[in-house]
């Protein structure tokens, strides 16, 4: 079992979900989200993790974000990126990866605040969520999806006001909500 900390943007997600139905292998596992803490093993302990998150969040207030723009990341993902609020999300991400989470930070993977839209790995590749960079890009499928996403002109504004701790099964076949953290207004 693993834990992750995510934000579910309070936006109309029908266009994103329709797109993800075609291209995102995780579409049925989790709603469109921004990940603040990636997979952390349950051995860290839920109580310790919750206390750490609460401690970090005591210094944070709600803040606006603007989702607009597309970016290829980790060589095979298409992301809806932040046009506003990027610095705040990165700063909060870094603060969360202190203390008990410091050993789990992945400096080898660039943190790009985003909503994942699709995975474009060649069919012969096996995707490992714990090591997302180890795939080859399916160029044809990626460029087709990129054109489609550009036509959608995805553009959303919302506020980061809550983060959600989720539990993820070892085989990444099930994600269960665990706890909500509300930022001060």
Protein language model features and the residues they cover:
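Active-site-proximal alpha-helix that buttresses catalytic centers in soluble enzyme cores
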Residues: 164-166
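Short, basic/glycine-rich phosphate-binding loops at helix/coil junctions
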Residues: 71-79
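Basic, often amphipathic N-terminal segments
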Residues: 1-66, 72, 83-162, 171-185
């Amino acid at each position: 079992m693993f834990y992750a900390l995510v934000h579910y943007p309070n936006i109309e997600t029908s266009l994103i979900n329709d797109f993800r139905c075609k291209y995102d292998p995780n579409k049925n596992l989790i709603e469109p989200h921004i990940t603040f803490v990636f997979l952390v093993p349950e051995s860290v302990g839920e109580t310790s993790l919750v206390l750490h998150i609460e401690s970090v969040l005591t210094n944070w207030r709600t803040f606006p974000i603007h989702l607009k723009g597309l970016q290829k990341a980790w060589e095979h993902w298409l992301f809806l990126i932040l046009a506003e609020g990027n610095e705040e999300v990165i700063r909060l991400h870094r603060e969360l990866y202190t203390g008990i989470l410091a050993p789990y930070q992945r400096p080898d993977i660039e943190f790009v605040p985003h909503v994942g839209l699709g995975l474009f790995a060649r069919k012969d590749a096996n995707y490992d969520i714990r090591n997302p960079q180890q795939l080859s890009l399916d160029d044809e499928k990626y460029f087709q999806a990129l054109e489609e996403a550009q036509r959608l002109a995805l553009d959303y504004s919302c506020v980061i006001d809550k983060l959600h701790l989720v539990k993820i099964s070892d085989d990444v076949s099930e994600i269960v909500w665990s706890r909500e953290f509300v930022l001060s207004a």
